[in-house]
A protein has these predicted regions:
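Structural signature of tandem-repeat unit edges
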Residues: 1, 7-21, 30-44, 54-114, ...
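Short, aromatic/basic amphipathic alpha-helical patches
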Residues: 48-54, 235-236, 279-288
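Short acidic, low-complexity intrinsically disordered linear motifs used
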Residues: 314-321
Length: 322
C-alpha cells in the first residue's frame, strides 16, 4: 500500500479491500485514528506502517488522542485481531500491540511464540494504570529487534531462556528488570537511559559486552553464578543522562548540561550487590564501583534492590516489586 489518501481526521478508518500489503510508513498521517479496519484480503502487515503515530502520541500527547490505534480484521486467512492487537492467523507471532496498555500488564497471548519486530513499540500505560509490567508467557521463544522500541515499562521480567535480538528494547524506559535467561546478549538494551533496579537471578550464567549502558542504573544484584564480561556496562560516553524525580533547580535552567553527568558522577550513582570474590565483585573493584555484599537470600536481595542500604530511599522504590 502506498501512502494513504484517507481522511486524516477520521477516527475510524477502513482500508479498501484492494489493499494486499501494508508497508512501512504507509499509514502516516492518520494521527487522530483510534480504529483501523483491515481488509480480509490483506497478505502482509508491518507495525512500521503506524509506529511513527505511536511516537507522536507518546512525545506530543497534548496534540493527539490519548488512545491507541486498535486494529480490526475479520474472515482473514492470514491474521487474527484480538482487543486491538494483531497476530498471525495461528496466534504464534504478535505483529502489533496497541500502545496504550490498560490494566497494568502487557496482554500477550499464551499462544504467542514470537514477539515480532516493532510490535510493541512505544507502549505505555493508559489512565489510571500508568505503570505497566511486562511478563512474558512461557510460550515466548523469540523477541525480535525493536520489538519494544521506545516502550515505557515499570517492571520487565524475562524468567526463561528466550532468543532476544539486538536492540529489542532499544531506547526504552525500563525502571526495574528481573532476568533469568542463561546469557544476556550484547546491545539488547541499547540506549535505555532509565534503568534503576536490575536483578540477575541464579539462572544467568553470562552477561555479554555492552548489555547495558551506564547512567541512571542505581542498584544491580548479580548472582554468584553469573560471569560478567569486563565491559558488560557500556561506559564509552563522556556524559550520561542524570535522573530526576520531578524536581529541578531554577539555577540550572540555563545550563545546557543540567540533565547530564560525567562518567565519574554516573559511577557514584551505581551500587553492585553480590557475594565477595564473585565475578561481580571483581568487576566492581576493577571499575571503581561501590560494591555491597548481599546474601543469596530473596529477602536480602529485595531489600538491597529497594535501596534500604542507602541514606535516603527513592520515593518509588516500593512501587517496583521484585
Amino acid at each position: 500500500m502506498e501512502k494513504q489518501t484517507l481522511n486524516k481526521l477520521d477516527k475510524k478508518i477502513t482500508i479498501p479491500k484492494v489493499v494486499k500489503r501494508i508497508l512501512e510508513n504507509s499509514l502516516l498521517g492518520l494521527d487522530f485514528a483510534t480504529d483501523i479496519i483491515l481488509p480480509s484480503t490483506l497478505e502482509y502487515f508491518t507495525p512500521y506502517a503506524i509506529m511513527e503515530i505511536g511516537r507522536k502520541r507518546d512525545n506530543e500527547s497534548d496534540k493527539y488522542p490519548k488512545t491507541s490505534i486498535n486494529l480490526h480484521i475479520e474472515n482473514s486467512d492470514n491474521f487474527t485481531a484480538i482487543n486491538g492487537a494483531l497476530y498471525t492467523k495461528d496466534m504464534k507471532t504478535l505483529l502489533y500491540m496497541p500502545n496504550k496498555i490498560k490494566g497494568g500488564i502487557v496482554p500477550i497471548s499464551n499462544e504467542t511464540e514470537i514477539i515480532g519486530e516493532g510490535s510493541c513499540s512505544y507502549i505505555n500505560g493508559a489512565y489510571p494504570d500508568f505503570a505497566i509490567k511486562a511478563n512474558f508467557p512461557k510460550s515466548v521463544k523469540k523477541i525480535c529487534k525493536n520489538a519494544f522500541f521506545g516502550a515505557d515499562i515499570c517492571l520487565l521480567k524475562i524468567l526463561s531462556d528466550v532468543e532476544i535480538e539486538k536492540t529489542a528494547f532499544a531506547n526504552s524506559k525500563i525502571n526495574g528488570l528481573v532476568i533469568n535467561m542463561e546469557t544476556v546478549p550484547s546491545e539488547v538494551f541499547t540506549d535505555c537511559e532509565e534503568f534503576y533496579r536490575i536483578k540477575f537471578c541464579e539462572g544467568v550464567k553470562r552477561i555479554e559486552k555492552n548489555a547495558f549502558k551506564l547512567g541512571t542504573i542505581t542498584n544491580i544484584y548479580i548472582s554468584p553464578n553469573t560471569e560478567v564480561d569486563s565491559d558488560f556496562i557500556d561506559m564509552s560516553d563522556k556524559m550520561y543522562i542524570k535522573k530526576h524525580f520531578g524536581t529541578c533547580s531554577f539555577d540550572d535552567l540555563d545550563n545546557p548540561d543540567r540533565n547530564k553527568m560525567t562518567l565519574e558522577e554516573a559511577k557514584k550513582e551505581l551500587t553492585i550487590g553480590g557475594e565477595k570474590n564473585s565475578s561481580a565483585h571483581n568487576y566492581a573493584i576493577k571499575n571503581d564501583i561501590r560494591f555491597i555484599e548481599v546474601e543469596n537470600d530473596i529477602d536480602k536481595i529485595d531489600e538491597f534492590l529497594k535501596g534500604y542500604h542507602q541514606e535516603s530511599k527513592f520515593e518509588f522504590a516500593e512501587e517496583i516489586p521484585f
